[in-house]
């Protein structure tokens, strides 16, 4: 839900002051990122055929339609990765039956949409990925792992020349972009994969560029709530805060109120109980220096499907760019949105 409030009368401002700290409105849910890989990707040499000899790939589904391409999801043991894998199958893409995760699973495999996905340890990544890429030409990797693995994983994908979509937040983002640019590898990197939220971010960027300093002197309060497994500050919140800073607002990231306690999420934030394990609620409240004017922006997401669908759109976009031999290699979700590739 996106809400915006504008108060100019002193009585309205007084009411706002009596209200106290920012509160969440009743949520509107549309549909975040749980993560798994805990180790980096060091190494031992074998082909995918040998590596999975005891786990024959013959059980994999028949070849997909000609317009499709292979997609490898890291990691299918996480809720976000699983959601992306399911969305990829629904879109007619060929789900590579291998994924890397430090989490042990029964029989070393998981089942997604009647497909068996064999789980390999991250330490085998450098030795196995080249064989997988050979067996699955035109493969695109999707990364939903953990913040600590972002840079190491991207470095590995770039080293092997594998195009990828980085949905994992966190890590050193400047280094991440530099790694991709230096390697000249195709990639989509975005802290936010939800298409409608990306459109909101784009609008914020336009406002910041067109009207710098418009909110100079205003006080900003930011609250974000995600499932307890999300370790870092919301990448979306960081992006919106950056826009407000360009608009003249003074704000430090350590001022963000992160809500991870389920009880607070229920009572303070208003997250539906069934979505405590997967949601993304954000509120930004601006108050003028004399407290006579206030603005409030809010966007709430329940579940993961909005991110999964956006990630698949990003992969489809990237595949199109690769096939056309586009000179530009590094993209974000705003590029995807502008292309009109949204399904």
Swiss-Prot record:
Residues bound to (S)-2,3,4,5-tetrahydrodipicolinate: 235-236
CDD domains from the UniProt entry: DHDPR_N (cd02274)
EC number: 1.17.1.8
Subcellular location: Plastid, Chloroplast
Gene3D superfamilies per the UniProt record, alphabetical: Dihydrodipicolinate Reductase, domain 2, NAD(P)-binding Rossmann-like Domain
UniProt-annotated catalytic positions: 226 (proton donor/acceptor), 230 (proton donor)
Residue stretches in coiled coil: none
Record bears the keyword Glycoprotein: no
Keyword Transcription: no
Binding positions (NAD(+)): 167-169, 190-193
A GO molecular function held by the record: 4-hydroxy-tetrahydrodipicolinate reductase
Domain of life: Eukaryota
A GO cellular component entry from the record: chloroplast stroma
Record's function text: Catalyzes the conversion of 4-hydroxy-tetrahydrodipicolinate (HTPA) to tetrahydrodipicolinate.
UniProt-recorded name of the protein: Probable 4-hydroxy-tetrahydrodipicolinate reductase 1, chloroplastic
Organism: Oryza sativa subsp. japonica
